[in-house]
Amino acid sequence: MADWVLHVDLDQFIAAVEVLRDPSLRGRPVVVGGNGDPTERAVVATASYEAREFGVRSGLPLRTAFKKLPDAVYLPVDHALYEAASADVMAVLRSFPVIVEVMGWDEAFVGVTVDDPAEFARSLQAAVLSATGLHCSVGIGDNKLRAKIATEFGKPAGVFELTQANWVEVMGHRPTSALWGIGTKTERKLVELGLSTVTDLATASADELAARFGPRMGPYFRGVAQGAGDTVVSATPWVAKSRSHEKTFQQDLASLDDIRREVVALAHQVALDVVAEGRPAVRVGVKVRFVPFFTKVRLMKLPAPTSSADELAAAALVVLERFEHGRAVRLLGVRAEFSDEDVEPKPSPSTYQ
């Protein structure tokens, strides 16, 4: 018997749930985002595989998606529906003698001790499909990093194993962006250092990486390229680190008074979540997306922890003054962050944080 980490990832989760609700959507390009109106300002939450064939992906502006694929079915986001479907899937996983660490609506790590992890993974897939009608891919690894990356090779609805034994063979020749946690910006910086592949990064000078990315992130990137990762799967309930609200405006805001008014309204919404959380906020952040699509975030530490809507709003206005004004605004957001100390566990997340 051996200890394994499995990464369970529901395939095109949101789109798949919408197809379960309306089977007539099966096989059609489905795009979910915002209020379902592709002429409004919002982004794609998810797209079915049929829509992805036309270049429609999560995070793409809905208007851009509509230009690429005007004949797709556009649907509004239904948080309650996806939350319920996710809970059903996690309940299936917990029915096995395993440890389940929920990572979001559509994914979880599973810790298990078995002789044949691939066979066990297929039994998980069958159980999830039978109980919920949803397909999932499963990555198998000797740590979380490898299991997470393995899932990408198993999509859709497949199983793939990635361990120390086959890490170099599978990953060595791939670009560094294939690694979990390395995005396109970091990839470009690595290329500037002559590090194009995973093997390049894994064998790079630790001192050189530390000089370019800092003493913490430099060695971290090198470790990721070597496949190093956490092996512990924890069932400890997820705890929110912050609460936030954002609003995208269909008409740009040009007046500073209008911007202030919206920030106060968002802060009051956030305060309701802070009170419900039962923990005071210690920091307040404001996010501003200027026209055409330039985003900045500012953050400040509060003089004292608070759950007061008025105090959070006042702090948000102070943060707002740290931005350079003069450009029209298309999106505003307010975030309240909690202290990491004396945290009381809460139920697992129902939305991405």
How would you describe each model-predicted region?
Residues 1-105:
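Residues that scaffold, gate, or flank divalent-cation-dependent active/transport sites
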Residues 7, 178, 186, 191-331, ...:
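DNA-contacting surface of Y-family translesion DNA polymerases
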Residues 17-19, 42-45, 146-154, 233-236, ...:
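Short acidic, glycine/serine/threonine-rich loops at helix termini
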Residues 88, 92-96, 123-132, 189, ...:
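Generic non-transmembrane alpha-helical segments
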Residues 100-104, 138, 278-279:
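Short beta-strand
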Residues 107-112:
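A generic structural motif
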Residues 114-177:
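Long, highly charged, low-complexity intrinsically disordered interaction regions
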